């Protein structure tokens, strides 16, 4: 394992490399061409290249967490006469529904339950019965449970029924291969501190340029106006409308270099998948049960049922692991008592082996 205070086994913020951290030791002027042209514009181009080889897409960077970018997309691209079908099977789909409702956006929620995979036939039925729907929005990797949702099936429906397609790929972009042009995705949303393995501070949207260009004047917010942010970056060669998180941006530029050095998204996906499979096998050997069937798992994070022991307390288990150098995540599923373990970031085979040994040592209810 690399030198650190503890290993973050979370879906982001996550454990970053020493060199990503060191990239933040430099200061940048937000008006300077070395920063805007040399760093910001390069990042925008690289993000589009990671998303698709096709022309006609652009990247917009936005200060804040991933949820800021999700709200910016919903509030900026759906017009007053628009209506969005939001597919929800976890906290992050539910958050999109809440955002739409607070902004007064017409919304058709489809909640299929936290441990159920969205059903394409049910989505098609909704589209047939509600022709007012103009947009479809869904989460790709739902970290509430660790489920990987079927964005390919929904992409086919979006194309067939001529709907604009919004995908929250917060914890999948950069860690799971995808081509947004092939999937007919109009807006893909992700964040600096997920699979690219940067640090928190900004999110980004990769958008079909023709669609984004039609969104002038639609935004329900000043600071979360995606169109205005895009035009500022386009017209001023990488300049942000408001203060740029310069140190986070420098860290992200380094993280993109390290993604390329690893072999790109496919190689990183293979590492994440190997981590997750090794984790699940080891946890089963220790007596833990995954919340989901193996066929539903993403390679990002896995939820496990809490031990059926009267003396078990998550906080005690958590602290015993932290004392050994590992940090895990509490559960977020409303109907099941569980906890979650992520395996993205600077996490390798040796780390999973060490984690499993630490978990075995932390099972105080067995002692």
From Swiss-Prot:
Its cofactor is pyridoxal 5'-phosphate. It is an enzyme of class 2 (transferase). The keyword Transferase applies. SUPFAM superfamilies: PLP-dependent transferases. Its EC number is 2.6.1.37. It catalyses: (2-aminoethyl)phosphonate + pyruvate = phosphonoacetaldehyde + L-alanine. The keyword Cell division does not apply. Keywords: Aminotransferase, Pyridoxal phosphate, Pyruvate, Transferase. One of its GO terms (molecular function) is 2-aminoethylphosphonate-pyruvate transaminase activity. Homodimer. Belongs to the class-V pyridoxal-phosphate-dependent aminotransferase family. PhnW subfamily. This is 2-aminoethylphosphonate--pyruvate transaminase.
